[in-house]
Amino acid sequence: MAPSDLSSDLLARNRVILMHFDTYSASLSFVCWDDSTVLWPDALPDWSDIPAPADAASAAYDGEAVRQALIARYSFNPGELVRISNFDHWAQTESGPVRIHLLRFNTFQAPKALLEACDGSFQNLPELRRADKQELTLLRQVFNLFIGGSSKG
């Protein structure tokens, strides 16, 4: 999935949840990739939540680099995609820690056609109820962040 100039290590150590939040209607939707996962570039194999590792500040987990990789891969408008820095989640996999980032389209409407051209589709939580249980737990945390009274990101 990644362009040849992107580090495979960067993509192996990071995942992205891509979402849109309509502040007018309080509608929250997530991008589901290939009708199978909400994590970009791939679903995670078996994993468990962990606290941030000691090397969390290293370039291997840089949220802006991950954001730029997604923008480069799909030619997204950089001004329309923001990183939600107060969403900071980590997963332990067989190959090591993976950071999970949250990126939000700040457009008036979700760019559905743009994502459909990238094999993604916007879906709300009820539409994702068959998703991986661990992914649903992450989406619930995003829901709580935006709708449940936490900071609006």
Predicted regions and their residues:
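Short secondary-structure capping micro-motifs at structural edges
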Residues: S4-D5, P53-A57, I71, S85-A91
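Ordered hydrophobic segments in well-structured contexts
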Residues: R15-H20, A26-W33, V98-R104, S121
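Helix N-cap and loop-to-helix transition residues
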Residues: Y61-D62, N77, N124, D132
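Active-site-adjacent beta-strand/loop module that shapes the phosphate/pyrophosphate-binding cleft
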Residues: G79-L81, S85-S121
